[in-house]
A protein has these predicted regions:
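Hydrophobic alpha-helical transmembrane segments
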Residues: 124-125, 145-150, 171-175, 214, ...
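Core alpha-helical transmembrane segments of integral membrane proteins
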Residues: 116-198, 206-229, 305
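Soluble N-terminal domains of membrane-associated systems
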Residues: 1-106, 110-112
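Alpha-helical membrane-inserting segments
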Residues: 133-134, 138, 154-163, 179, ...
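C-terminal transmembrane helix-loop-helix hairpin of multi-pass membrane proteins
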Residues: 195-203, 210-217, 228-253, 324-482
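Generic multipass alpha-helical transmembrane bundles of integral membrane proteins
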Residues: 219-227, 247-334
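Conserved mixed alpha/beta catalytic, RNA-binding, or beta-rich assembly cores of soluble enzyme
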Residues: 128, 148-168, 172-181, 292, ...
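Structural signature of hydrophobic alpha-helical transmembrane segments
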Residues: 122, 137-151, 208-222, 273-290, ...
Length: 482
């Protein structure tokens, strides 16, 4: 292999990985997809060493004749599930249809340059109604749902506008949280101020006027990085997972400061401390709110439009299962009364198991359906309530306990959601791993035959035979153990 061609292949491999990292793929998926790209590019896995980090990817190729090390910076971090799906599909298509390097590079360029599937205002409206769906899950009425959505839409649009003017990302988060909370407070006056209520029609007066303040800034909560952080830590990618966690913490902290400043202005802080989050709705209302939240947040994640109904169904499954297990007679609801932690685990697991089959119907990675489906369960309010408790400490007995209680509840719920999403897929992926390897090997052999390259049955049989020996060894180990 010529040095120029080898360097070109390494560049393409790094570009494949950087597209995934900048689109918020978890580290395991990045490595799996890069290894599949290596197979297409004809790079021997024995000579390749990959290093994946939040800001940089590195690949080293060392054989008897060459030793090259190349780097690729990852700077434009965002969330694009459509990009993840396209890159995954490209690596399979490139092998099956025997792409040239030029074709593969053009396909990467097309994916990189493709516009997002939703306009900024569509994303703002979707994210705003998603916050309204959260508000329903916290017990608000449908009038408050629309007030919360309106405040969130305007706050979110401001959040997207400020970085285009050169504003720091975390400052933009704080400002947008401040504005959204003030707007929600202004709508609450319509239902609490007697003078305003006198001139308002009854359908515009909410019986839960303060609930929109609780949910209006939840468009900021970074649900995908939270889940990826837990997944990376569980998979052993500690460094990348830790960076994701710190970035998430800074975003939530900026949001908490924005809300704290808004509280100083409006003088109302019950939504950040004592306002109840226990809903008392019918399950059909939970289902509608979950579908709205799942589809709304999917616009933020740039999901393919055709998957919006699928994600809506996933959100309904996740939230309704969670609520049935979480709620119960102790809080005046129908359910098993087992708590938020167990409910979150059950809801995420139910969706993950369903998507194991459904992903083959829609030809997308598992992550592209499960993550938007479980986002409506992310405990964003508990997260910023925990940080707000620490920000507002005055030395009163019990303040640390309140903050730690919210922090622990939020952490356990997030861990359980990530476990519910990851574990069923992990077991299934290991179950079919040999099948996928055989499929990939067969495609590579067929590709070589089409190109007129000589493929000996012995070369293929060595790998298959090694697989059979491994299975026999496993069976022998089990028999010996028994």
């Amino acid at each position: 292999m010529a040095e120029t061609e080898l360097c070109h292949k390494l560049d393409l491999l790094l570009r494949t990985g950087s597209l995934l990292m900048e689109s918020a793929a978890d580290t395991s998926r990045i490595l799996r997809t890069m290894k599949r790209a290596m197979a297409f590019l004809g790079l021997d896995e024995r000579y390749i060493h990959l290093y994946v980090n939040w800001n940089v990817l590195m690949v080293n190729y060392s054989d008897e004749l060459h030793s090259f090390t190349k780097f690729q910076r990852c700077e434009r971090h965002g969330i694009s599930l459509a990009t993840i799906a396209k890159v995954s599909r490209l690596t399979w298509t490139a092998i099956r249809e025997d792409f040239s390097l030029v074709q593969y590079e053009k396909a990467l360029d097309d994916i990189h340059d493709a516009p997002r599937g939703f306009t900024p205002w569509q994303v703002a409206i979707g994210g705003g109604f998603a916050c309204g769906g959260f508000c329903i899950q916290f017990g608000c009425d449908w009038t408050a749902f629309f007030y919360c959505s309106l405040a969130a839409i305007l706050g979110f649009r401001l959040r997207m506008f400020l970085p285009t003017m050169g504003c720091n990302n975390y400052v933009a988060i704080g400002i947008s949280a401040f504005v959204a909370t003030l707007l929600a407070w202004a709508t609450a006056l319509l239902s609490t101020d007697p003078a305003m209520m006198a001139g308002m029609p009854s359908w515009m007066i909410s019986t839960t006027p303060w609930h929109p303040l609780m949910a209006c800034a939840l468009f900021i909560v970074p649900g995908v990085p939270l889940i990826n952080f837990v997944s990376d830590m569980l998979d052993g990618y500690i460094e990348t997972g830790f960076i994701r966690a710190v970035n998430t913490l800074l975003m939530v902290l900026a949001m908490a400061f924005g809300i704290a400043f808004a509280i100083k202005v409006c003088g109302i802080d019950n939504f950040a401390k004592t306002l109840t989050m226990t809903p008392h709705h019918e399950y059909w209302e939970y289902a509608i709110a979950a579908a709205v939240s799942a589809m709304g947040f999917s616009t933020i994640f740039n999901i393919p439009r055709r998957l919006l109904p699928v994600v809506a169904v996933g959100g309904i499954i996740a939230v309704c299962v969670r609520n049935f297990i979480n709620l119960g007679p102790s809080n005046g609801n129908l359910g098993l009364d087992m708590g938020l932690t167990i409910g979150s685990l059950a809801g995420a697991t139910a969706v993950s198991i369903a998507v194991i089959k459904a992903r083959h119907w829609f030809h997308v990675p598992h992550q592209c359906i499960t993550i938007p489906s479980v986002i409506p369960m992310i405990p964003g309010v508990l997260m910023y309530r925990a940080l707000f408790a620490f920000i507002e400490m005055h030395g009163v007995v019990g303040e640390v306990t309140v903050g730690m209680n919210n922090a622990i509840k939020a952490s356990l719920a997030i861990i359980c959601i990530a476990l519910g999403v990851a574990v069923p897929n992990l077991f299934f992926r290991r179950f079919i791993e040999d099948t996928r390897k055989r499929k990939l090997l067969a495609m590579l052999v067929e590709r070589k035959k089409r190109n007129g390259e000589f493929v000996t049955p012995h070369a293929v049989g060595v790998r298959q035979g090694a697989h059979r020996r491994t299975r026999k060894e496993k069976k022998h180990a089990r028999d010996t153990h028994e």
